[in-house]
Amino acid sequence: VSADGEEGFPGNLEVEMTYRLDDEVNALNIEYRATTDKATVVNLTNHGFFNLAGIAAPTPTVNDHIVTINADFYTPIDEVSIPTGEIAKVEGTPMDFRTPHTVGERIDDKFQQLVFGAGYDHCYVLNKTESGSLELAATCKDPKSGRLMEVYTTEAGVQLYTGNWLNGFEGAYGATFPARSAICFEAQCF
């Protein structure tokens, strides 16, 4: 619950998230519901970290993960990773995941956007066939384990984050997570 006026936004906002594992189709479904009593801004996402290779010791990076994103455009960031408000073409840049590429293939390129984000930390403007429809936004595959993740969303954008600022924190089973040891796909408005 977010009270009317909290963080400067109008309305009492109630948010409900449901996480559901579907064993029949081997899927994790995340559903969001929000209600408010005044017109306000709501832009919910999730920041789940994934490493499809598993948590071997040491934790492998996601550099070998193969990513595709159904987007012709992305939103550039400034030197402190804040979106500039521009929308730029991915074509001809290391931001282009319209065809499969490994994360590590171009992540250390001297392309200004990758330097600003210390890797990928950008919102991609999805090629939607219909506003609000549930569509495939991205895929991610680990070639060693064979694990494949498909990301579907009703939102207009998806943020790709490659764990650039992970600093070796300890997770489950004593695994540590250094930079680039996880990947996020954050469905969102932009």
Where are these regions (language model features)?
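An exposed, glycine/acidic-rich loop-and-rim segment of catalytic or binding clefts
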Residues: 1-190
